[in-house]
A protein has these predicted regions:
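Contiguous beta-strand segments within globular domains
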Residues: 103-142, 228-237, 247
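Hydrophobic membrane-insertion alpha-helices, especially the h-region
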Residues: 1-12
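Conserved, compact domain cores that house catalytic/ligand-binding motifs in diverse enzymes
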Residues: 227-277
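Short flexible loop/turn segments that cap and initiate beta-strands
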Residues: 135-163, 248-251
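Aromatic sugar-binding surface patches on proteins
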Residues: 59, 158-180, 272-289
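Short glycine/proline/serine/threonine-rich loop/turn segments at secondary-structure transition edges
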Residues: 181-191, 286-299
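Juxtamembrane proline-rich low-complexity "stalk" or linker regions positioned immediately after a signal peptide
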Residues: 11-95
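Short beta-strand elements
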Residues: 95-102, 198-228, 307-365
Length: 365
């Protein structure tokens, strides 16, 4: 996480100053809650998303036979903050999904369990729904809970703990928990833990969530939007009301007139307190290469403030619950020119003079 955040801010831009023009936003179809997975006896971080190709436009991942310069050119056809989006990139399409899976009990005996929840980020008064499912040889197994609690795990000096009550429903133990009852003032990591007796042995399971209390919300989307074509790219202007100044990162996905994913965009800048225009640039060549046309609409609009030196170090904004639809732009309204920048040209020049690895893996001259 730290490495990724360093990368976000090494090229931070200047803060926008103009408020986005007001338009009407529509409510999207609700996404189905994702299943989450359990943890073992030891406390571990949530599992990462399943592997996806970071650059689907380059085809199936594997050993490249390109020389470094060619490989670099292929990887940088599009800018790092606006890239193609495909239906298999669930980490972007379902950014609050968890990825726990059914796992074997420590003692074996054919027992497996899944301890999970319906989300990873919880904000304000939201309710976290968690489930514990236990099976023996694939069949549901009734168990007795010996412990169940939630506690603050970060910051480490704050150890609020509350007991959790689970109820059985269809062979699955279920709980609803409101982190707001902990009375926290800032973004915190919260761990949920259970211990159960399956008739042979006891087993512990654990997962973490990140919670942002109402008092700790750094900024909100106002619901005002605008769209334009600038320098051959689609720009969606998003109005943001900032309470806590600092470095922000805001992401959104773009879908075409057929509701197919087209592109992902990231805005990053230092924002002062007040209302600002976060300009999400969807690169023109991404749209042209997808042969996409409008009206486009955005989804999964979310953001966070980077709080350096804190743990957790991302203060979440409430995701925007609606959508915004652009005008009916034709495909040829956008440029098919490749991304270019001074940094890209410097890297091309550097790689062009480096003959050490010429030929790449599996090739020679």
């Amino acid at each position: 996480m730290i490495v990724a955040l360093v990368g976000w801010w090494t090229t931070r831009g200047t803060a926008p100053v103009a408020a986005a023009p007001s338009t009407t936003a529509t409510e999207p179809r609700a996404a189905a809650p994702a299943r989450v997975a359990p943890a073992g006896a030891a406390r571990v971080a949530p599992l990462p998303p399943p592997p996806v190709s970071p650059y689907p436009e380059r085809g199936v991942a594997g050993l490249s036979t390109d020389d470094p310069l060619t490989a670099y050119r292929k990887a940088n056809v599009y800018p790092p903050t606006s890239r193609p989006l495909s239906s298999d990139q669930l980490d972007l399409l379902r950014p609050n999904q968890r990825y726990e899976v059914m796992r074997a009990a420590d003692h074996g005996d054919g027992v497996s369990y899944l301890f999970t929840a319906d989300r990873y980020f919880v904000i304000g008064d939201e309710i976290l729904a968690s489930t514990l499912e236990v099976r023996r040889n694939g069949e549901p197994l009734a168990v007795r809970l010996t412990q169940a609690y939630a506690e603050v795990v970060s910051p480490a000096d704050d150890r609020h703990r509350v007991a959790l009550a689970f109820a059985s429903s269809g062979g699955v133990l279920m709980n609803t928990f409101a982190p707001a009852q902990l009375g926290l003032a800032r973004q915190s990591g919260i761990g949920l833990s259970v211990e159960f007796d399956d008739g042979v042995a006891t087993q512990r399971a654990h997962f973490d969530v990140q919670y942002t209390p109402l008092a700790g919300i750094p900024a909100r989307f106002t619901g005002a939007f605008g769209d334009s074509v600038e320098a051959g790219s689609l720009v969606v202007h998003v109005a943001v009301d900032v309470t806590s100044p600092g470095p922000y990162v805001i992401d959104a996905n773009l879908f075409d007139a057929a509701d197919q994913p087209v592109a992902w965009s990231r805005f990053k800048a230092d924002l002062a307190a007040g209302t600002h225009d976060a300009a999400l640039v969807f690169f023109g060549k991404v749209i042209v290469d997808a042969n996409a046309h409008g009206p486009f609409h955005i989804g999964q609009l979310r953001g966070a403030r980077f709080a350096a030196g804190r743990d957790p170090d991302l203060e979440q904004m409430p995701p925007f619950a609606g959508s915004f639809t652009t005008r009916a732009y034709a495909t040829d309204a956008f440029s098919d020119a490749e991304y270019d920048s001074a940094d890209k040209q410097r890297m091309i020049e550097l790689l062009g003079h480096d003959h050490t690895h010429r030929g790449g893996a599996g090739r020679g001259e």
